[in-house]
Swiss-Prot record:
Belongs to the universal ribosomal protein uL2 family. This is Large ribosomal subunit protein uL2. Keywords: Ribonucleoprotein, Ribosomal protein, RNA-binding, rRNA-binding. It comes from the Bacteria. The keyword Kinase does not apply. SMART domains: Ribosomal_L2, Ribosomal_L2_C. One of its GO terms (molecular function) is structural constituent of ribosome. Part of the 50S ribosomal subunit. Forms a bridge to the 30S subunit in the 70S ribosome. Residues 200-274 are annotated as: Disordered. One of its GO terms (cellular component) is large ribosomal subunit.
Amino acid sequence: MGIRKLKPTTPGQRHKVIGAFDKITASTPEKSLVVGKKSTGGRNNTGKMTMRYIGGGHKQKYRIIDFKRNKDGIPATVKSIEYDPNRSSRIALLYYADGAKSYIIAPNGLEVGQTVVSGSDAAPEVGNTLPMANIPVGTIIHNIELRPGQGAKMVRSAGAFAQLTSKEGAYAIIKMPSGETRKILAACKATIGAVGNSDHALEKSGKAGRSRWLGRRPRNRGVVMNPVDHPMGGGEGRSSGGHPRSRNGLYAKGLKTRAPKKHSSKYIIERRKK
């Protein structure tokens, strides 16, 4: 999946770098796998703002993604590669041999017409999903479960991948994209390969309007706010704001926010890089 750097015909085009849609083969999603999606504007059920800088944007419909891949032993053919407005990666439409249809996150190298399968007996090939107990050591994987049968929770964004480094008893040792090394039950499933659309990280909006299309509002700096709005606000004229803090008053640079007694810490062998 490539990128397009536009010619500077207007100020908004000058620095714009967008993804190329050359690998996308269908413009309309599968109707049975699409549901409506209500925009929240960053508000919760009581109307209170819980997330700043969200609002507006183009109306989006949610594509139902199969993160469980539990149709074991039934081969599926890749019908199309599609754009999904709800995530950075592309999605692939699968037609199963029994007539079922589903969407999966499209891994790098997956082509239309290719056959994928899930289950313990599946070959460790791109797009196939199998328990990590059956995946060879050193394999690049994504869409990793944290609990067997729960569905993929980790390594799902564009270009992301983890590596199965070793196995110890009932656990598989995984090196995560963050650099963290941790144990996960070997009965958990993972999909072979890296997530596609790796050039997503190189994209640039080019203009404020494109950010608004995506539902991103202007992000105001704390140092230019009033003291009532932010710990770094106020002062006479321009001020440095003192020690960088979040809006809640926590130190913004270097403070560890992970709970010291979190139960899952015993599964982490090596903490992530800074």
